Amino acid sequence: MPVSPPRAAAFEILLRIDATDAYASELLHSLRFSKLSSADRGLLTELVMGALRWRGVIDQAIAKHSAQPLGKFDREVLTALRLGAYQLLFLDRIPAHAAVNESVELVKQARKGSAAGMVNAILRKIAKGPRDRSDISHPDWLVDRWTQNYGSEIARKICDYNNTAPRQAVRISTIQSNVGTAAPGCPRAEGPIGKRIEANSEPNRAAVDGQPRAAVPTWSLDDLRADGICLVPGNLLRNALTVKSGDITHSEAFRERRLIIQDEASQLVALLVGKGKAFLDCCAAPGGKTRIIAEQNPDSTIMAMELHPHRAALLKKLVMSDNVRVIAADARQFPLDKKFDRVLVDAPCSGTGTLARNPEIKWRLKAEDILRLQGYQLEILAAAMNHVAPGGRLIYSTCSLEPEENERVIEKALAVNAEFRLVDCRDELRMLKERHELMIDNIESLLSGAHLRTIPGVHPTDGFFAAILEKK
């Protein structure tokens, strides 16, 4: 019996995620699966992300009907069970027999045929039983931590947000964008989107040094509508849009980097970097923040560092700007003796603010990882502080919700380096508001003391933290 392409692909991706440190978002967009039809790609994404988001509920259902502990299953068998159980518990449109039979076939094709009968029996019991989706599907230690740090109500909001597929945010590239009107049926041929895009289109921005800007290719929201893509205004930023429907990666605007996929909180962190002449981006891949810095500072020089050469190559491909130099280097051991006006440390972190997009993280992460990461973050931050010019600024950010990776890092860094002071992010957000970059009215909702903080479920974004340090 053949297995449908999306189920076979989902099985392969889930196996790789379980066996390695691979990320679902990267595997789903790999060339290996690029030839799937649009419908099959949609089902593939649903199967992979759903099975990861709801693994807690799925594993409870499997354990309820199995005499064998889950830890005793072969990886291939447990993956097939999880894939089948997700369809039975959450996808009403999938016939139960298809979910069961193809999961059994996956086990056979993985040369685990001796377990086929058991897989069949467990999934049929799940299919006949009640659908209990009440579990929050997060590790207890993580929920307990959020409850302690944010309270039970916000902890629940975080979990609920993480268990829902988030809408994709995109940013209008001010380097290349010259946008026409929206299509009928997709909001804003006239209105916020049209005004917002036209204001950011290169020909409509002020001339540089009295010289008109060069013409760039025009793209229209009509073009996106023709591809089945509908955009609505973002939630925080003038330059951000939200994908209401369709696949933006299939559009010419995306392929030509006129629209960049980037969460709004990530965009906001890059805007906090501000203006300058010489920039250092210490942990720059995948490059979204670097690109914003380059767009905001076209006459500056920017050095973008990335530890891993293959990620540095991807960074260079995304940024594609003459004023950006990409180097593969360890941010803890900066290879040049140079000072910068602005330094961005978007530190490697636990990623607990991005679990809606990266649900595999919550099943990999261990409590002890957070303190281990803190040590790494402190090393990077200490090295970066040595390269800030007098009067210059360092912006430290993570996509973590954990205080140990955020406030505690800043406190420890300032305790051993009296040359720096903490700058209140409130002032920077007000300036962004005055420049009509920031569209939200309640700036205070984005703050935790002097720091920027967004929380999934409280804000319609990933969870981010940022602090601004200024050298005296």
Task: Annotate each language-model stretch with its function.
Residues 1-180, 185, 191-192, 196-205, ...:
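S-adenosylmethionine
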